[in-house]
């Protein structure tokens, strides 16, 4: 076998857990991957976001993303640990074809610049209301 495949795991934690617990979950799942001789490439906390539909009576969730490279056996171990955790409300692992692209930081600099639209002054042929009033007074 030439090179180990790349994987990306995204999981959603309950929104009511404290930030320290979120960090402990991230460390816990990274350690599970390292014990299975898997290289953890990247881990990102995506933050609290609104869910598309309620999951276990939660309308929001804390999104966390793990990118790793391994032989594939680590996925079952990782997903089993997530399934047993009460704090994880949803998870998914996707096998990537090649190396994962490095995510770009989200900031206002990366947003396309909006061009300022200056209103053009157009004169109409019909007289305005003010002009009509002036004409009627004369």
Curated annotation (Swiss-Prot):
Keywords: Ribonucleoprotein, Ribosomal protein, RNA-binding, rRNA-binding. Residues 106-138 have a biased composition (Basic and acidic residues). Residues 94-138 are annotated as: Disordered. PROSITE patterns: RIBOSOMAL_S6. GO terms for cellular component: cytoplasm; ribonucleoprotein complex; ribosome. Pfam families: Ribosomal_S6 (PF01250). InterPro entries: Ribosomal_bS6, Ribosomal_bS6_CS, Ribosomal_bS6_sf, Ribosomal_S6_plastid/chlpt, Transl_elong_EF1B/ribsomal_bS6. GO terms for molecular function: small ribosomal subunit rRNA binding; structural constituent of ribosome. One of its GO terms (biological process) is translation. Belongs to the bacterial ribosomal protein bS6 family. PANTHER family: MITOCHONDRIAL 28S RIBOSOMAL PROTEIN S6, SMALL RIBOSOMAL SUBUNIT PROTEIN BS6M. Binds together with bS18 to 16S ribosomal RNA. This is Small ribosomal subunit protein bS6. It comes from Prochlorococcus marinus (strain NATL2A).
């Amino acid at each position: 076998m030439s090179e180990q495949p790349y994987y990306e795991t995204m999981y959603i934690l309950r929104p009511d857990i404290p930030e320290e617990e979120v960090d402990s979950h991230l460390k816990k799942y990274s350690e599970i991957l390292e014990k299975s001789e898997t290289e953890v490439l990247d881990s990102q906390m995506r933050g609290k976001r609104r869910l598309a539909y309620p999951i276990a009576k939660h309308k929001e969730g804390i999104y966390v993303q793990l990118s790793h490279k391994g032989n594939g056996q680590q996925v079952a171990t990782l997903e089993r640990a997530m399934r047993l955790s009460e704090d994880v409300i949803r998870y998914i692992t996707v096998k990537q074809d090649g190396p994962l692209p490095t995510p770009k930081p989200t900031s206002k600099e990366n947003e396309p610049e909006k061009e300022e639209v200056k209103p053009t002054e157009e004169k109409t042929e019909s007289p305005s209301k003010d002009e009509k009033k002036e004409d009627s007074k004369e």
